Amino acid sequence: MILVTCDDGIESPGLRAAVRAVLPLGDVIVSAPCEQQTGAGRSLPTFNDGAIHEVEYEVDGHRVPAYAIHGSPAQAVLYALVELVPYRPVLCVSGINFGANVGSGVTASGTVGAALEAADQGVPAMAVSLETDKKYHYNHSEEVDFSAATHFTRCLAARMLVRQMPADVDLLKVEVPCDATPHTPWRVTRLSRQRYFRALPTGRRSLAEKRRLDYEMVIDHATLEPDSDIQALLVERVVAVTPLSLDLTSRVALEELEAQLR
């Protein structure tokens, strides 16, 4: 069984594209937030009531068991694993997200957060995002073409089902350019240390005025790592496949750091 989720919510065309990608690979179950949860990261908020609603879900003539969760993307995964699936899934696919998730800000991504939660529960996982214009980041536009992202989701999911990942690879983060085709090359990258999404001042006239943070996307080409996800996706225009680990420990020599701190 393959579990599919998406932080953009149960109505997202990207979620439907992910389901379409993995339908030929095995039984599929969908568990996704009932509403848009972009930026939720791996959060497990206590204010969500956890209600679960079974929904009618059909993709290409196939009826798929699907559930809308009053919760975050990570909670949608947890509810699926403890209450909805009859046995442990062999794979969790989170996506396909509207907009790239690259650089140092990926911990804020609900797409990545859901995949991290699945991985922490022992389920191999992948988080898939499609680069889109900023205007599509928070909506369910049917204008966005997910066909190439669907292709790469299917190809990489198929590989994950038959090939065991190395011990330190808990999930794959897949970034697909907006102009990709099934013939676009892909390569394995590292996570850039650059902050791609940068917050902007709200322009509020008083602190009490209600304003949401806006953001811009910025690349510092002078310091951009040549083997990074940002370089591959946004400069070279290839699909970036980044192995991520649940182990967030710094790669510094621990003995040296301890000596420095004492």
Locate the predicted segments by residue:
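Short acidic, Gly/Ser-rich segments with clustered Asp/Glu that frequently serve as metal-coordination loops
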Residues: 8-13, 206-208
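Electrostatically charged, flexible surface regions
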Residues: 144-262
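Short acidic, glycine-rich surface-loop motifs adjacent to enzyme active sites
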Residues: 90-99
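A cross-family phosphate/adenosyl-ligand binding-site feature
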Residues: 2, 18-83, 87-88
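Hydrophobic/aromatic beta-strand patches that form the interior of the parallel beta-sheet core
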Residues: 29-31, 67, 93, 124-128, ...
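Glycine/threonine-rich flexible loop motifs
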Residues: 100-109
